[in-house]
Regions:
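Basic, polyanion-binding surface patches
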Residues: 1-167
Length: 167
């Protein structure tokens, strides 16, 4: 296979930018910027997310069978970069960001446009990112979204011409 062609083709798949959060209930909190996310069913509402297997977030999600996806808006580029590295939970803030706990215990970013709390229904363990299937159990949209909701979301292409993930 031509490696350059593979990279170019796979980078044509559009990605939103999200922050996945999880809490182990014992003081362990993790957050990670993720972009391999999609809805896969209406009833029950299911989402899938690719989570890097050697991340702290993956360990907590696998053990607790729950997570929250925080949707970032176009103005949240800085948040995306904040959670590219391991998160710190100090003084009730997650890497300096205001949060509150959802019903599943995972942090919800106060700045997020929306968040969905999920219970894990299955994990496909293949590759360097495992596919986590989550049933949406709660949804939060703290403020009305003007226009199409999908136009409000931060996308990989919004992070600049030199920021890629995948390929």
């Amino acid at each position: 296979m031509n490696a350059d062609a593979k990279k170019a083709a796979l980078r044509m798949i559009p990605y939103g930018i999200y922050v996945l959060t999880a809490d182990d209930g014992k003081g362990g909190v993790a957050a990670a910027t993720v972009n391999w996310v999609t809805q896969t069913a209406f009833a029950p509402p299911l989402v899938v997310v690719g989570v890097k297997t050697d991340s702290g977030a993956y360990g907590i999600v696998k053990s607790t069978k729950s997570f929250t996806l925080n949707m970032l808006g176009k103005a949240h580029k800085g948040l995306a970069f904040t959670f590219f590295k391991p998160a710190q939970f100090e003084g009730g803030k997650l890497s300096g960001q205001a949060v509150h706990k959802g019903t599943n215990g995972a942090p919800i970013l106060e700045a997020a446009l929306a968040a969905v709390e999920c219970k894990v229904t299955s994990i496909v363990e293949q590759g360097d990112h495992h596919i986590v299937v989550g049933e949406v159990t709660e949804a939060h949209v703290p403020n009305p979204i003007s226009g199409r909701p999908d136009n409000a979301i931060l996308e990989m292409k919004d992070l600049g011409d030199n920021v890629f993930y995948g390929g």
